[in-house]
Design a protein with these regions (language model features):
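SAM-dependent Rossmann-like transferase core, predominantly class I methyltransferases
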Residues: 151-187
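C-terminal edge-of-domain segments
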Residues: 140-156, 368
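Conserved S-adenosyl-L-methionine
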Residues: 174-292, 308-309, 315
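A short, flexible beta-alpha/helix-coil linker loop
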Residues: 100-103, 159, 305-309
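Non-catalytic nucleic-acid substrate-recognition regions in nucleic-acid-modifying enzymes
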Residues: 2-138, 378
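C-terminal catalytic and target-recognition region of SAM-dependent MTase-like enzymes
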Residues: 286-378
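Flexible, glycine-/basic-rich loop-and-beta segments that form/coincide
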Residues: 53, 158-163, 167, 372-378
Length: 378
């Protein structure tokens, strides 16, 4: 088996560059591409990526890429790969698939042929015609794009947004990975006050606190790669120990959130406790329209209701206007919000100083920041 393999850290549309920079900071050079960031690394590096990436959805091992213009070419290409290095005679290996602009447009047929080719390979290697599939799962994916087939193994298992601290999503759930990306893209930096005036169940502020405390987002969960065959388990254990040692919750200061819903605030506190950050973020019941904070500099960051239903739109627009007033009451502060509402800036009362477009789930959104310092004229 080789020391280095090709990997992909998948990401929501618009966040590929954010994930590539995360990998670079881990000492793993990466290149952003549509749908994620591609990199070459060891199994140990992939374990660190699973443990530390805040904004990626999954880490995938690329088994190979090859031309497949016919089902026969797909079968032979899959069969030629060393599946026995990762799959035992008892491993379950479900196959998912995706096709785009390929001559082989039947996803179901591509999945079936891929499964059959892997079985034929394993039959010859394990010298058996019967596979129990009674042990751990190794998830296989076949993707065909423009007649190029790519075969991957899922090294994450459960998606990376599942940190383990959130047990209730609320009415407007924001994935932990997206929340971490918004924190990263906002003007806030550790040491500055940060406040979410509509915190809901606390995800944005908890992700900010985890970053400030250098808490690995995957610290309390497991990953599929840890169950793979022939893995460096001692190295994986050391990587976890290093992450535990790096966690410094005493560094957290100046992060707070508020919501008008007492139940949401109670859940935010519970999630904070489950993240191992009990008492490190101040969550309180309060109306965002009455918010008044101290400090000459700081950052507001929030996920407002989008008003997707026509009946909610006017109420949301009035709320956006109140947020514009909130920023005016806090000169020297910035305010960042993610929204799919086309009239957000008009209701807010000013144009955004910075915008970034991406998808929150299936909704096309813009991440807007107001109150950035004007560049000095030369």
């Amino acid at each position: 088996m080789h020391d280095h393999f090709e990997w992909i850290a998948t990401a929501a549309f618009g966040l590929e560059g954010v994930v590539a920079r995360e990998l670079d900071r881990l000492g793993i050079p990466a290149k952003a591409e549509n749908g994620g960031a591609r990199f070459t690394a060891t199994f140990e590096d992939a374990m660190r990526a699973n443990l530390w990436l805040r904004c990626a959805d999954r880490v995938l091992l690329v088994m190979d890429r090859f031309e497949a213009r016919s089902f026969e070419e797909l079968f032979e290409g899959v069969k030629a790969l060393p599946w026995e290095d990762f799959i035992t005679a008892k491993t379950r290996f479900p196959v998912s698939g995706n096709c785009a602009r390929s001559q082989l447009m039947s996803i179901r047929d591509c999945q079936s042929i891929t499964k059959k080719a892997i079985v034929e390979r394993l039959k010859s290697k394990y010298r058996t015609d019967w596979f129990e599939e009674s042990e751990e799962t190794v998830a296989v994916s076949v993707t065909l794009h423009g007649d190029i087939a790519q075969l991957t193994l899922d090294a994450s298992g459960v998606a990376l947004n599942r940190r383990g601290y959130r047990t209730w999503n609320g009415e407007a759930p924001l994935r932990e990975t997206m929340a971490a990306a918004l924190v990263s893209l906002s003007p806030w930096r550790p040491g500055m006050p940060l406040h979410d005036p509509m915190c809901g169940t606390g995800t944005l502020m908890i992700e900010a606190a985890m970053r400030m405390a250098n808490r690995a987002p995957g610290l309390t969960r497991s990953f599929a790669i840890e169950e793979w065959k022939n893995m460096p388990t001692d190295s994986f254990a050391q990587i976890r120990d290093d992450a535990k040692a790096a966690f410094t919750p005493e560094r957290i200061e100046g992060i707070s959130g508020a919501d008008i819903d007492p139940q949401a605030v109670e859940l935010a506190r519970r999630h904070l406790h489950q993240a191992g950050l009990d008492g490190k973020v101040r969550f309180e019941v309060a109306d965002a329209r009455n918010c008044q904070l101290e400090g000459e500099r700081g950052a507001f960051l929030y996920n407002p209701p989008y008003g997707e239903r026509l009946s909610d739109r006017k109420e949301c627009e009035a709320l956006y206007h109140e947020m514009g007033l909130l920023l005016r009451r806090h000169p020297g502060w910035s305010l960042s919000a993610i929204t799919s509402h086309p009239g957000f800036e008009r209701s807010f009362g000013r144009r955004a100083d910075k915008k970034r477009r991406f998808y929150n789930g299936r909704l096309e959104c813009e991440f807007m920041t107001f109150g950035l310092p004007k560049p000095k004229k030369k």
